[in-house]
Amino acid sequence: MNPVGLWILHFDWGPSGNYHWTPLYFNFDGTFAYLAGANEGTWAQVDDMILWRFKRLPESENNTIYSGNAGRNFMSGLMFSFQGEKGSWYAVKKGTKVFSIKEKVKIPYLIDKESKPKLDPIGKKM
């Protein structure tokens, strides 16, 4: 698996089930850029495990970290922010065809009002 390229990151801070998305670009030199802001960081991969860390606070170890499993066109895992927030995420490589089953009946636990994220992908309050 080679993560280099454009990915769409879907993230959810907390167990709300409301995922928000943003583009993320992984460079061949072990860096990445969060396209919705001037944030960047570094990434590393070993076999099917991937880890990336934002460099929001370059002089500090307290930066948001994403870790998870990675396949050719999909990856998912957990994230931890510098403020102590926890969440889950998944990313799909740009250009990947994704199919899903649409439910005919809206199940009560899936009905939820649209909300704006309280935290952005790097864990900063919005």
Per-range role (PLM):
Residues 31-36, 51-53, 74-80, 100:
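Short, well-ordered strand-loop elements centered on a beta-strand within folded domains, enriched
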